[in-house]
Amino acid sequence: MASLSSKSALVSRLLQVKKESGKTYTEIAKLTGLTNAYVAQLFRRQAHLKPETASALKAAVPALSDDLLAAMQEIPMRSFDPTVVQDPTIYRLHEATVHYGESIKDIINEEFGDGIMSAIGYYCSVEKVKGKEGEDRVVIIMNGKFLPHVEQVN
């Protein structure tokens, strides 16, 4: 397993290659058939690049070396630096989850029963839309499989 410092170095290299490509996550997503959030997860080593997707990613970002593509295909250590929560955007996402969390849970339970929304088999995307007054608005779509809690019997 790679150390967190080597993960950090790899992520820095991947983000530099992405920056040099001049492409956004959304542009890369359109070229690869992935969501923009998943592409960002790949470059941040929070997701595993499937071998069958590697060629599309290489075509979208030609400067990705074979070594970088191979590293992206290793199963990642899905972790985060605890100080990342101090970033205002991430903090506001956390704040929204805390503020709406119990209400969202209640609605999930009413609509589906006793269970959770999985982050496995999960799709996420971020979209930019115009609001009613012409202002830019952020739409985050979180699409997770419902997993019912099961009764544990012998």
From Swiss-Prot:
Keywords assigned by UniProt, alphabetized: Lyase
One GO process term, biological-process aspect: cyanate metabolic process
Gene3D superfamilies xref list: Cyanate lyase, C-terminal domain, lambda repressor-like DNA-binding domains
Pfam families per the UniProt record, alphabetical: Cyanate_lyase
Domain of life, source organism: Eukaryota
Function: Catalyzes the reaction of cyanate with bicarbonate to produce ammonia and carbon dioxide.
Protein's name according to its UniProt entry: Cyanate hydratase
Organism encoding this protein: Physcomitrium patens (Spreading-leaved earth moss)
